[in-house]
Amino acid sequence: MPAILDVHGREVLDSRGNPTVEAEVYLEDGSVGRAIVPSGASTGSREALELRDNDPKRYKGKGVLQAVKNINEIIAQELIGLEALNQYTVDKTMLELDGTENKSRLGANAILAVSLATARAAAASLGVPLYVYLGGVQARELPTPLMNVINGGKHADNPLDFQEYMIVPLASTFKESLRWAVEVFHTLRSILKSKGLNTNVGDEGGFAPYLEKNEDPLAILVEAIQKAGFEPGKDVALALDLAASEFYEDGKYILKAEGKELTSDEMISLLEYLCDKYPIVSIEDGLSEKDWDGWKKLTDKLGKRVQLVGDDIFVTNPQILAEGIEKGIANAILVKVNQIGSLTETLDTIRIAHQAGYRTVISHRSGETEDTFIADLAVAVNSGQIKTGSLSRTDRIAKYNQLLRIEEDLGEAALYRGILNFKR
């Protein structure tokens, strides 16, 4: 098996123009793997630590030279000579080297970049696609995309409290679903223009129009689906990411758009009302990461009707997820590789979720890059769902294009389950 010959890190930029970490892993047989890590805007309080320099003279404190230095001067020395195909040993070595619960010594961004680059180098050495290396012969399911086309919350400068309003295309193949979504996206742009609303796009490629009520985007999306020639709920469904932790204060949910302060029970009633009125198949972070009792009530109330995705509450952490499963909280988990900070731990989380009957949604971050690792990962683990932004911005489209390539590569073996991924 090929051993690691060298590891190199560098500071590059993400889609928001902020520094991030890129790593390259070189093997003795000449194979090379490269990976760039993303960065989030709304983050869970228990995420692994993204190491920043905090030097106000460089990139307003957001530089990552220390993380890069940790790769080049600490991590590299420990990994040289290890077998690249033994991902567990590579990751375990870095985790032990860091020695902290949240990867604060070396930085989750440093560890993850090397972890993902190692997997790429191993796949290159074997001469197989990344999704095949990660998932083997069973890696054949293309994910249904949840596409963030209207932004609110921390992703936009508008009154909306909810962070993401998504369309979910339900065709018979990924390629056809992507086409349907693009047609709805461009129809949505025309509708927003006709209403005199802003059609500039945000971090994730979605629109951020000035809408006054949290329900308004749902009505506009239904209109866009219909005008594009599709049936809401049957051809194209809807999904929400409230990022509710961002507007949770002192035990109340502060909805500034409506001028209301809601209890957990009232928030649950609001979500139930929206599910009754609109073809919503998935709700992410419907309640705060601190509101575990509320999450249990939400799951009991809506868990048999819609997918309830835990993001901030689980932060892709296998131990926290196991606790949530035991308490009957949510029925799906959002998987972000940089929340936990290594490929091995990410795969552990996915395994625990699937064994418990929880669905997994592989996800990007708002600060993305041209790296397409998560597209391969979604197919490798047969996740069945992916969140990687809207239908604009190359950093988002890159993942969709990679999925098109994978679907073509799989040929007749490719599976696309569409609405079946959301059936309770």
UniProtKB/Swiss-Prot annotation:
Gene Ontology biological-process entries: glycolytic process
Catalytic center residues: 204, 336
Binding site for Mg(2+): 241, 284, 311
Transmembrane segments: none
Molecular-function annotations in GO: magnesium ion binding; phosphopyruvate hydratase activity
Superkingdom of origin organism: Bacteria
A Pfam family it matches: Enolase_N
Any one GO CC term of the record: phosphopyruvate hydratase complex
Protein's cellular compartments: Cytoplasm; Secreted; Cell surface
Binding residues for (2R)-2-phosphoglycerate: 163, 336, 365-366, 387
Keyword Cell membrane attributed: no
Cofactor comment text: Binds a second Mg(2+) ion via substrate during catalysis.
Pathway: Carbohydrate degradation; glycolysis; pyruvate from D-glyceraldehyde 3-phosphate: step 4/5
InterPro entries named in the record: Enolase, Enolase-like_C_sf, Enolase-like_N, Enolase_C, Enolase_CS, Enolase_N
Cofactor: Mg(2+)
Catalytic activity, reaction form: (2R)-2-phosphoglycerate = phosphoenolpyruvate + H2O
Keyword set includes Cytoplasm: yes
EC number(s) stated in the UniProt entry for this protein: 4.2.1.11
Family matches, as CDD domains: enolase
HAMAP family given in the database record: Enolase
Biological function: Catalyzes the reversible conversion of 2-phosphoglycerate (2-PG) into phosphoenolpyruvate (PEP). It is essential for the degradation of carbohydrates via glycolysis.
Record NCBIfam families: eno (TIGR01060)
Family stated for the protein in its record: Belongs to the enolase family.
Name the UniProt record assigns to this protein: Enolase
Species of provenance: Dictyoglomus turgidum (strain DSM 6724 / Z-1310)
Taxonomic classification: Bacteria, Pseudomonadati, Dictyoglomota, Dictyoglomia, Dictyoglomales
Gene: eno
